[in-house]
Design a protein with these regions (language model features):
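Metallo-beta-lactamase
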Residues: 81-88
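Short active-site segment of divalent metal-dependent hydrolases/proteases
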Residues: 89-90, 236
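Sec-dependent signal peptide recognition
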Residues: 2-8
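Divalent-metal coordination cores built from histidine and acidic residues
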Residues: 73-78, 93-202, 220, 283, ...
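Histidine/acidic residue-rich metal-binding segments in metalloenzymes
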Residues: 176-203, 208-315
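Histidine-rich, glycine-flanked metal-binding segment
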Residues: 22-32, 37-79
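Divalent metal-coordination and catalytic microenvironments
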Residues: 35, 50, 55, 75, ...
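C-terminal motif of bacterial Sec signal peptides marking the signal peptidase cleavage site
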Residues: 14-16
């Protein structure tokens, strides 16, 4: 195998520096030799050899290993692949670029895909990438379907890209649904979870006027029935340090009341230290609450997002 990889990534395997170090006489399917093995979970960091059999790591050791195939990782880092929970570029070329950046599992827990098209979304990607992939069912697209009348397999099956069409209208963002519309939105989310969505993705921060606190709670309740997370671009983002944390607290308090997981998306805005402290302390108490950050200050979005309105904009 080629040995000129910049970063060598191991996919869907569990790392442990205590794993079967004495099995150095085994025959392995693949051995990775002389690399700097780093496991963030166990804090293992040393030059070592890795033995893989039947798709799993069975040895991490300084002893010599032999296998059917070998990779000389001298001067390289051997580490688990990254899981990106906020990956919108879910196309073959997007996955390919992600793999080159170390992302072996690409998920979209923010925008997602319309529930009625989740099965088609997965089918369109089957066998076409080496990456792991998944997508949430979209709160925003459910609102667009039943408030604005957006529908069409030609674009809604495309997940986040569909926003270029649905956001031409404004009901998805600004309108409170009727009782009938609200129930239809929840049914659409349930349909997506039944079809394999990894959770619910909500862009409530784009829909702060249209989505009531009751609606957000009921959206998270749907995910809770399946034990799956709701990821949210939280309400009041962009906002000041108090508003940002109030948005995170809405998502988290709903999750705690429902006994459900939650992901506070890109919480590194104003007041992020409090959001981080809240997440860490809840994790220490055993709650499945987590968050993500991005390494950049801002990204592009559609001009009719509610937080870009002059009365809402925060410099």
């Amino acid at each position: 195998m080629k040995n000129n990889l910049i970063i060598l990534l191991i996919l869907l395997v569990s790392f442990s520096c205590d794993q079967k170090k004495d099995n150095t006489n085994e025959s392995y399917d693949l051995v990775i030799l002389n690399g700097r093995v780093i496991d963030p979970e166990t804090e293992f960091d040393d030059i070592a050899n890795v033995g893989i059999k039947d798709g799993r790591i069975v040895a991490i050791t300084k002893e010599p290993l032999e296998g059917t195939e070998s990779v000389d990782a001298t001067g390289k880092i051997v580490a688990p692949g990254f899981i990106d929970t906020h990956f919108h570029f879910q196309t073959p070329i997007g996955y390919s670029l992600g793999l080159r950046d170390g992302v072996t599992s690409s998920m979209d827990f923010e925008m997602g895909c319309a529930g009625s098209y989740i099965a088609d979304w997965y089918e369109a990607r089957a066998g076409k990438t080496q990456a792991n992939y998944g997508i949430a069912v979209s709160h925003e697209f459910a609102r667009a379907m039943f408030i604005d009348g957006s529908d069409g397999a030609d674009y809604l099956v495309n997940g986040p890209i569909a926003a270029y069409t649905t956001r031409a209208k404004t009901g998805w963002s600004q309108t409170r649904p009727t009782l009938e519309q609200g129930n239809a939105i929840l049914e659409e989310l349930d349909k997506g979870l039944q079809a394999g969505a990894v959770g619910i993705g909500s862009t409530v921060g784009y829909m702060r006027e249209g989505v009531s606190s009751r609606e957000m709670f009921e959206v998270q309740r749907v995910a809770a029935r399946y034990g799956r997370p709701t990821g949210a671009h939280t309400r009041y983002t962009l906002g000041n340090d108090t508003q940002e944390n109030n948005g995170a607290q809405e998502l988290v308090s709903n999750a705690l009341a429902l006994g459900a997981p939650a992901i506070v998306l890109h919480f590194n805005n104003s007041g992020w230290r409090l959001a981080h402290q809240m997440i860490i302390e809840l994790q220490e108490q055993g709650h499945n609450i987590w968050g993500e950050i991005y390494p950049y200050a801002a990204g592009s979005t559609t001009i009719n997002a509610s937080f870009l309105e002059p009365e809402s904009w925060i410099d």
